Amino acid sequence: SAFELQNKTQEPLTGRKFEFHLFPLTYRELANHSQELMEQRLLNHRLVFGSYPEVINNQGNEIEVLKLLADSFLYRDLLMLENIKKPEKLVKLLQALAYQIGQEVSYNEVGNTIGLDSKTVETYIQLLEKSFVVFRLPSFSRNLRNELKALKKIYFYDNGIRNALIASFQLLEGRQDIGALWENYLVSERRKKNFYQRFYGNSYFWRTKEKQEIDYLEEADGGLKAYEFKWKEKAKHRISKTFRNAYPNSEMALIHSGNYDSFLH
């Protein structure tokens, strides 16, 4: 696992240091391998089962493979290597985070739910970040008093792992969490894309106390790009007027299932 490799390679290096991350396969890698139209046809499958190579190469056995990945990598490796004192709490934390993708996460609230103090929750989340299971997205705040400043959203690097944690593998049609799966997929894919393409800007979400929000922001070279995510191609949605007035020079776009390819290339 990534965390095991990290533990084994802590020796200091002289000179320049390069850091390499191996994520689940990206949209671009899969599209280049099997042609873009074919990959787009598999979008529903990716939202449920993710993009780990083991899953891609074992069609028909996705659930079994994901359960093995979760059991061996998340539970056994993490619990063994970090010597976690309350392993059952880490499992509950992962499940709580899986149910909250696309939502602001309060360490206090999560801790109260699973029986841990907020500091321990944060420590466990940092461990999960080091092992490339989840990552945090901070809130953006510059101009307005009513912008949320302290909360963070937490996303999984892979939708399949998220679904494995809560044993939720039903087909996309009829699911109540399509919006959350779509947001997690887009944000995680964009994160992988930006890393591989050496994008050195910052990423955020934006929300006010009145619950006006922007799903995803990127800030680079003095510019700001705002993105709203909607699953349905014909969904009508306007970027928050409050945001537009506060940041009038921002670029703004709606990303849906009919145009997402340009967002991930």
Describe the residue ranges of each PLM region.
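Interdomain motor-coupling "hinge/lid" segment immediately C-terminal to the ATP-binding subdomain
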Residues: S1-S106
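A short acidic, leucine-rich amphipathic alpha-helix
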Residues: N108-N112
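A cross-kingdom feature that marks ATP-driven nucleic-acid transaction machinery
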Residues: Q126-L127, V133, P138-H265
